[in-house]
């Protein structure tokens, strides 16, 4: 109910404030007058601070009148809201220059296309998370956790994205192959065995092509990391 205004005033427990609790309410009012409103001089706040006095309700009523609150003692919820509004206005007035010169949060932070640039690579939670992902995806460990994360990102983009999964799940329609047009290079003496040998050779060629594709993808991924200007090339050597 009052959480936002209490937060604006740096109240110690904005979410848990219970205005129906008499002791908490009285302590809150003392804090509000001492720290924010400051309508009374310090020496005039004694009666308001004496929260255990039987005269405190009368003092509270006097306080509402002194600050020109339009609500009565019985209208506690409304009077609290009004007092908080007064405190916020006074707080802003005391610190107007500070608030006017304040810049929106993250206004000076450029939105980089590189999402990894603002990560704290020394954070233990970050390291533990990267290591867990690397183990899950069977990625080679590296002393540079940021480089490991980049490798994870490349793998996810290439293999686990929605497009990659859809592509892998789609049926591959093969073309009919005329086995007799593929020269085997030897003769087993059996036509059936010759056809089986041709099929095995074609399957082996297909596996080699897939392996070459994976090698090319790995080379591209490594080149992307090496081309990063933030990569520390002192970690490796070229030549002797």
Curated annotation (Swiss-Prot):
InterPro entries to which the protein is assigned, alphabetical: RTRAF (IPR019265)
The protein's matches in Pfam families, at most eight in alphabetical order, are given as: RLL
Q: What are the protein's UniProt keywords?
A: Cytoplasm, Cytoskeleton, Nucleus, RNA-binding, Transcription, Transcription regulation
Q: Where is the signal peptide?
A: none
Q: What is the lineage of its organism?
A: Eukaryota, Metazoa, Chordata, Craniata, Vertebrata
Protein family membership: Belongs to the RTRAF family.
> Which protein are we looking at?
RNA transcription, translation and transport factor protein
Task: Establish whether keyword Translocase is in the entry.
Answer: no
What the protein does comes down to:
RNA-binding protein involved in modulation of mRNA transcription by Polymerase II. Component of the tRNA-splicing ligase complex.
| Top-level taxon of origin | Eukaryota
Q: Can you state the subunit structure given in the record?
A: Homodimer. Component of a tRNA-splicing ligase complex.
Q: Name one GO cellular component term.
A: nucleus
A GO BP term here is: tRNA splicing, via endonucleolytic cleavage and ligation
């Amino acid at each position: 109910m009052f959480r936002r205004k209490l937060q604006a005033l740096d109240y110690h427990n904005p979410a848990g404030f219970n205005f129906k609790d008499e002791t908490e309410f009285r302590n809150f009012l003392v804090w509000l007058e001492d720290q924010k409103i400051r309508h009374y001089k310090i020496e005039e706040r004694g009666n308001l601070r004496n929260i255990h006095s039987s005269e405190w309700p009368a003092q509270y009523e006097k306080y509402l009148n002194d600050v020109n609150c339009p609500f009565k003692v019985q209208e506690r919820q409304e009077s609290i809201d009004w007092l908080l509004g007064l405190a916020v206005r006074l707080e802003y007035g005391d610190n107007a220059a500070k608030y006017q010169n304040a810049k929106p949060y993250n206004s000076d932070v450029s939105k980089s296309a590189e999402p990894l640039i603002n990560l704290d690579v020394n954070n233990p939670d970050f390291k533990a998370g990267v290591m867990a992902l690397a183990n899950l995806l069977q990625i080679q460990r590296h002393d540079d956790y940021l480089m490991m994360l980049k490798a994870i990102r490349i793998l996810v983009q290439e293999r686990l994205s929605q497009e990659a999964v859809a592509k892998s799940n789609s049926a591959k329609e093969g073309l009919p192959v005329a086995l007799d047009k593929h020269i085997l290079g030897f003769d087993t003496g059996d036509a059936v065995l010759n056809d089986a040998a041709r099929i095995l050779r074609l399957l082996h060629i297909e596996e080699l092509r897939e392996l070459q594709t994976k090698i090319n993808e790995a080379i591209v991924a490594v080149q992307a990391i090496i081309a990063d200007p933030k990569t520390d090339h002192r970690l490796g050597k070229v030549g002797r």
